Amino acid sequence: MSSNTAAPGADITHPQARRAIISSSIGNALEWFDILIYGAFAVVIAKQFFPTGDDSVSLLLTFATFGVSFFMRPLGAVVLGAYSDRAGRKAALMLSIMLMTVGTAMIAFMPSYASIGLLAPAGIALGKMIQGFSAGGEFGSSTAFLVEHAPHRRGFFSSWQVASQGISLLLAALFGAVLNNMLTPEQLASWGWRVPFIFGLLIAPAGIYIRRHLDEAPEFKESSEKTNAPLRDTFVHQKMRLLIGAGSVIMATVSVYLSLYIPTYAVKQLGLPAWSSFAAMSVAGLIMFIGSPLVGALSDKIGRTPFMITSSALYIVLTYPMFVFLTNSPGFLQLLLLQTVIGVLMTMYFAAMPALLADIFPVATRGTGMSLAYNIAVTIFGGFAGLIITWLIDFTGDKLSVSYFVIFGAVLSLIASLSARLVLRLR
């Protein structure tokens, strides 16, 4: 299989392209907006739902709940990914966005621990688990839907998944900066943190409406590669592809969650004001939004792996010095520089990755294969990233522990990207 081997058939018209991009991206954007907002307001949520008398323990419990929701992702990947391979991409996309909306509503309106006791953290955990199940099938189904609309421009079309995450990162950062700057700590704790979740709920009906009026992906409809057991076929016949796919997702996951964790790191470890950390994070989101379609389009011409290999190598070389620089000279400009570098490297890697995943798996098992590969990596290296980093810093007393986690992920993804190029002959 080669990355420049496309299915027969012409690419779709511009109106169809716009509908496909918007419908796929809006659900992905909602998913990531909720994830990013939860992480961005972790310090506030910890005090409202996990009061222990120890801020570090409360924060650990908040991130643990965040991580537990990711255990639902592989289950969602299996159920919704296989559903998309049997019933179609459109049906799976409809189901995933409706489930995401339910989970978001539960978090947005959940009373605090002071109001209903243990039901409050239990309700937050349940809402996050529903979101995790939904997110487990969202990426694979929506990315498959995009690439199957334009087999000759997979890189460009699938990169809009990443651009939509850039919008989510930008919006989450702006909400964080504005709310922290305009509200008192008491107002933020009482009701301010709920505002972005309610905003996310306002987006959901538009996404549901758009997806309901979609046509099925042309390549999926025309394909003769159909299977009644996509999960079995993926595990039996595509184990190496699944392993390489999961490995290739690691650096993308670590990059996003690194950018997400930095506001907490800046406030808790460096003592910087919350608004400055969110303002710096918005730069990474802006770079991701603007740069992703450019990288995706270039990957259609020169291949996916050159971007991914280069980005992984630069992460390995630059991460430790960047955090030494920030830790020794904490300040807004230093934080801004760090987020800018992360934004560039994250975009280089992440924007090329969805098309590579689509190249790895055939049409018949693409929804299942992509969902599993993506969510195995995201569960391990994303869901527990904040928990692992917070614990490492508390356990070792070394503020640079975050850089070791990033470098480890970069090494694994470099190996996976090289394997995709050398073993699977993908470019």
Model-inferred region functions:
Residues 207-214, 408-427:
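Multi-pass alpha-helical transporter architecture, strongest
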Residues 305-352:
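C-terminal transmembrane helical hairpin of 12-TM major facilitator-type secondary transporters
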Residues 42-75:
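Extracellular/periplasmic helix-loop-helix junction of adjacent transmembrane segments
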